[in-house]
């Protein structure tokens, strides 16, 4: 099972957890969860006016070996207006635009989508059962 929790944070709200959204999916090949502004295809939906987040920004896909992968999907713009980081404990990694990284099995961490133009972020915590 992959469990996700999402909080949208703006300026003075840093550290607040009000309005947290949750989603989970079984670790089965082909299972998928998405994060973005499009309510039709995303399990976790960000505010409509947060344009630094694409309609479908992040995708969590379970592969054939039951390992989850995080992808930052390429949007309609050639240059993104955000940056995405994967943080697991003391380890932090920038996720490339249009790129994919595996999530650690039996681990927990956070994916941070940071607005490049202001103090806003989408923080997605994850727990991947081992």
Segments predicted by a language model, with ranges:
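Residue-identity detector for glutamine
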Residues: 74-77, 93, 114
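Short hydrophobic/aromatic patches on the structural cores and recognition surfaces of FHA
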Residues: 35, 57-61, 66-87
């Amino acid at each position: 099972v992959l469990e996700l929790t999402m909080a949208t944070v703006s300026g003075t709200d840093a550290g607040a957890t009000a309005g947290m959204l949750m989603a989970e999916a079984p670790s089965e090949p082909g299972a998928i969860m998405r994060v973005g502004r499009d309510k039709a295809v995303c399990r976790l939906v960000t505010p409509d006016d947060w344009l630094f987040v694409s309609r479908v920004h992040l995708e969590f896909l379970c592969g054939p070996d039951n390992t989850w992968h995080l992808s930052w999907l390429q949007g309609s713009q050639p240059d993104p207006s955000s940056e995405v980081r994967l943080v697991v404990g003391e380890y932090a990694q920038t996720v490339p635009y249009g790129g994919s990284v595996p999530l650690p099995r039996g681990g927990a961490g956070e994916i941070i989508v940071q607005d490049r133009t202001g103090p806003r972020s989408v923080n997605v915590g994850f727990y991947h059962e081992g």
